[in-house]
Amino acid sequence: VYLFTDEISTASIVYTFWITVVTVIVTIAISYLLALYLRFTDNKVSKFIGTIYLLPRFIPSLVAVYAMTTIIRDSGLLNRISLLFGNNFKPGLLYNAKGIILMNIWFNIPFATMIIVSALSGIQDSVIESARDVGANQIRVFFSMILPLSIKDVMIAMTFVFMGNISSFTTP
């Protein structure tokens, strides 16, 4: 009871929930677009992205946080590169919600994308071709076939991302 009546505890819970919801929305949006690209294109770029998008899963989280800190801090790599072009770019992404959300997205995109790619791979090409044969354009095919057939897996990905972030203590 004290947890929900204390003003500091309540503010912390609301802040954590807000960061988690924003992270879930952005992660699922990026992951779904990436999964669509990986599923429906077959070229060298998509094969390269299909290999490299899993990279964050193999980097320990503490190492990734430290690496990102050296890149996005006000005296980090982004600022030094901008100084070469005469700008003093201070991203302001460290020690605030934007930095936490950025790191949470980095950690969760591979996992959510794997789930959604799996769902999209389960949609047979014949289903999409059938819809196009009866005159459906790409937008109609997406909203009437692809999205409804993949929404359950998207909800699963959302649940995993939500649960991973609501209890995450990796990124301070």
Spans of features found by a protein language model:
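Short hydrophobic faces within alpha-helices
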Residues: I13, L55, S126-V134
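Glycine/proline-centered hinge or cleavage motifs at structural transition points of membrane proteins
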Residues: V134-G135, P148
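Glycine-rich helix-loop "coupling/hinge" segments at transmembrane-helix boundaries
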Residues: F169-P172
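Membrane-water interface segments at the C-terminal ends of transmembrane alpha-helices
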Residues: V1, E7-S121, L149, D153-S167
